Amino acid sequence: MKIVASWLLLTAVLFTFAAEARQTINGCEIKRRASCPGANLSGANLTRSNLAGADLAGADLSGADLSGDRITEANLTKANFSNANLSGAVLSNTYMSGVNFSRANLAKADLSQSTLPGANLREANLAGANLSLANLKGTDLTGANATGAVFAMASLVEANLTRADLTGATLIGADLRNAILVEVKYCNTTMPDRSINNSGCLK
């Protein structure tokens, strides 16, 4: 029994150590409140990491896997997430001015109450994403897949949504002043005034 108890204790200690072990990539320690401005994390596997409160301004995370990550209240100013996987990631209350999310996978990600003025979201996958109360002023959403996305009370002032797919999206209370809405696909889309737009549904 003592041998079994000792083995269980050792296993628990090793498990705890592994859980607390921190990954360091190119000098950047992956942890809460990490200070890694300009870091090169391209192609890194950072799945389910906790980067809440981190400073990743100007960092290169192109092609990185950040699925399921927690990156709340972080500074992602001008960071590069092109072609990155952020599906299911939590990025609420995060500052992302000028961030590059082109062709990134943000399916079911939470970007609520985040600040993304001038962000590049060209051809990004925003299916089922939550962008409620987000500041998307001047963002480029050209060709983005926003099916089922929620933009409730979001600011899309001067945003470019050319060829964006808003099938099943919710835009209740969203501000679309001076937004570019050329060839946008509307189907079962809830508009800012709560009306349903089915103009793009296949007949």
Role assignments for model-derived ranges:
Residues 20-203:
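Tandem repeat scaffolds
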Residues 16-18:
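N-terminal signal peptide c-region/cleavage motif recognized by signal peptidases
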Residues 2-10:
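Sec-dependent signal peptide recognition
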